[in-house]
């Protein structure tokens, strides 16, 4: 039978509940326990798929095609465990389900209320994750802040959960903030006390407090917090600001978080194996030479809009003993100032996914610059479509070529709507979503990077390469290096004569992990490193490798 951990947050929003939940998942897994983590989001949207990236950040796509909160990306990257649509729950999806049941007569004419019907549906979703995942421990992060009216049904549901399982089968963790007041030179505990008081008024007594702070929390302060909040001093867990989110599991391990959780859950505290994770963090803190990577997008004002892309680049740099010098480049600014100005000195260019017309010409200009300057380039989803548009306009002489998404009446729709999308009206949850196979062409750059004939990647798109232009595309020197098994849908393109120029219709960033970077991102960073000046000893090593025919085998033509 599964055990359950609930993570709430107080004092301020964006306090790091998702990282705490993901870190606990990592620590439990290091002790041999299987884990599943779900997010309860208090907004009324059914899912974040139609929400603006400026408001919500990126949409993380699961294997089964759910459009979810970006925290699920943290869960997957930290635990190396695939989540599903069951792991993402919103207020909108709960109300939709309850109303649909009411319309079907499932409540036998009863009055449908927040309690017990909404809270009961929430509890059912948590139980469903436990039964479908067969996890030893199910961790649930409750979005929002204690005191928000939107979160009340979720908090009531996790209070009621005590009646579903034994008290020894669940633990409540409350993440809070200890602000430092410079004039008094003190960390203040009063906001934490009031946050816990609010939680208690709902009927939840936290078992552990994770206290965020920018400086050390001494034993006297922990004793004070524990006394006022009704938790043992040992269960007051400091969480100091970290230089990397990947350092947080190690910090929380040192502070005893997992040990205390296991004690509350009456589970054995097995030996923990965090050696590989510690080595990863050591490499993060002691990186090699920096590679300058330009991320050209339309949502660059909010970095979270491209969170998984950035993490995938970090993973690749870790594997290549490089440090990431990331440059955020607004695609619209390229339209105003030119690619030569904004991309000068870059070692690689990434054009990620997106929707809509704004900034597309800037992305196309960035891709042209990377192609002509022979700078390593990786395009993702819309980035691949922009690479096709760039080819059509600048190499195929189709100067008005574009995507049918951007200009439905274009005479040269080199990107057009997927046939199965022709009659789709609703926007939410209706794209080509989730994992699909891609057959990789033998002898291609992609084949050398993947080392596999068939790969499975996550998708999120409505538009595709228009096969009416396939022959012209191939005659121009480009290669279609990956396609759907039936050969109809173009999944990967590349330019063989270029040091590294590849783009994919899918989102490889969702499959990258700290200790297992995605091959396309690792290939990009490896190619970017070839542009760096190297020390005499490194130059000699490369010369020897070249003489032996073994320099960078994954990128050899």
Swiss-Prot record:
Name of the protein: CTP synthase
Pathway entry: Pyrimidine metabolism; CTP biosynthesis via de novo pathway; CTP from UDP: step 2/2
InterPro entries the UniProt entry points to: Class_I_gatase-like (IPR029062), CTP_synthase (IPR004468), CTP_synthase_N (IPR017456), GATASE (IPR017926), GATase1_CTP_Synthase (IPR033828), P-loop_NTPase (IPR027417)
Transmembrane segments: none
Protein family: Belongs to the CTP synthase family.
Phylogenetic classification of the source organism: Bacteria, Bacillati, Cyanobacteriota, Cyanophyceae, Synechococcales
Residues at the active site: 381, 507, 509
Domain Glutamine amidotransferase type-1 residue range list: 292-534
Record GO cellular component, one term: cytosol
Top-level taxon of origin: Bacteria
Gene: pyrG
Additional facts recorded: CTPSs have evolved a hybrid strategy for distinguishing between UTP and CTP. The overlapping regions of the product feedback inhibitory and substrate sites recognize a common feature in both compounds, the triphosphate moiety. To differentiate isosteric substrate and product pyrimidine rings, an additional pocket far from the expected kinase/ligase catalytic site, specifically recognizes the cytosine and ribose portions of the product inhibitor.
Organism name: Synechococcus sp. (strain CC9311)
